[in-house]
């Protein structure tokens, strides 16, 4: 079992996760950081002050305020707008490494993502439930 904290993932450990299917876990301090950031973002979303990408549109719609009732739809639409990819699927070990790297970055507590989402990513990685990621055109965002 490899315990991730966002700061100590080495190439050797990453290869154990990607190639050897070593299971991972998130340390408690990192979980607290994620929860704190998530609550901060949730609090911002519920206030009237506009904050880009949380309760406003994106890009040229940055000045458009999104109603509180539509915030969940805004986030769903953002995910759908990034769902693209062409070419051959990447090898599973590459995607496993990508998942581990993403989890490791998210547990630093800077994104505002919910802990439940990260724990689900960990569960999927540990169960070897791996998404198809295509070699060209995949997008990523914080």
Regions from the language model: what does each represent?
Residues 1-142:
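Conserved, well-structured ligand/cofactor-binding cores
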